[in-house]
Amino acid sequence: EVKTLFASAQCPYITFKGAILREYYPVPESRAMGDIDVLIKAEDKGKIKKLLISNGFDCVKENGPVYNYVKNGVLFEVHTKLISCYDTEPFCSAFDYAEFDGFDGKFDDSFHFTYLIAHMAHHFKFYGAGIKLILDLAVMLKTANIDIQKVFEYLSAVELEKFGKTVLTVCHNFFGEGYDYAIDTKNVEKYLCDCGAFGNENENKGVTVARRELEEGKKYSPFMAKLRLLFPPYKKLKEIDYIKFIDGRPWLILYAWIYRIIYNFK
């Protein structure tokens, strides 16, 4: 239905993440999917919102560049940016890396694979990252057409080469796919296991804070970790989608802390 509506409005869109990844699995139904993600052009946001609401979709959340719509129990995440924290080339020109059948777009495999690594880096930084994210990489490496040299060209543009080599080494260690870059990944592997299968659903935020502090050479303190969970600094807050209003306005940090607490407990 969504595809038909977007085509009727002549709005190009790209389906990505779970709805595409599940087709690479031997049994697509085995790849759990909490929502359907589509990318649209920013200038079509208003038209799409009006179109979906007039056709029975409820707009349940507006979160910066992401609008959530629900119909018949299915959640659709409509994005106007592919990944906010890396809104530079190549990700800011995502439509240039897709092939279209009419208005229906699909990313080139190597670009989509690169996006998954960048998306994982975002999860490591803010939410926690589960083993499922590594499994997605393994399945794509096994079944899709991945140009790893091109992947690292894309990662280099957003300064994620080291992270890419780390997660591909973990992928090799866990599932026998990927590459062994002779990196010590024991701490990363433990972190992933502590976060569980899905990461964001079973997220252990204390683990996330501990990892960051150890990476920065700080002595881990449970009390200070709890404070940092409640009151993250400005540079972290401005990267959270629902607190984008603070970007460029550091004097609003007190309001942002309060808003964040209310948002997460509403």
Regions found by a protein language model. Give the residues of each.
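Conserved NTP-donor binding/palm subdomain of two-metal-ion nucleotidyltransferases/polymerases, i.e.
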Residues: E1-G34, I40-K266
